[in-house]
Amino acid sequence: MDSYKRIGNIGEAAILNKFVEMGVPVYIPFGDNEKSDLVADFNGKLNRIQVKTSNHFDDKKNNFKVSLTSSTIRNKNHYRHKYSKEDIDYFGVYNIPTKMCLLLPIEKFSMKTIATIPFPYEDKTHNQYEAINYADYLFENIINK
């Protein structure tokens, strides 16, 4: 079983690699205490990216889920932090089994704690989660060249 830290490192490396493949300049904030993991220069501005990694894919439901929060433990108390547009501009999401890289804009996902991504896309608006068409959030569809 991989540690959470290792899984996160795999996701950060995959998202970084995707930006580099697309010719997007990427900067890495120093230290481990920043809200963003990467800063990428695209669409005319520097964008703060918080990377989230999912290492599961539900074959029966054809989807994967990814947490859009961070959690810390201080003095035996568990704290969960929701990100806002003051913290980041995008979630860079990587799913290990499918090798899918997505960019989720914070404006559309700041109120969510978990994103459920159906793959391939199915409209599930009548179900218990909002339909998210993964194709809308592929790097190629977010980054203007």
Task: Give the location of each predicted region.
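Mixed-charge (Asp/Glu-Lys/Arg
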Residues: 1-34, 40-145
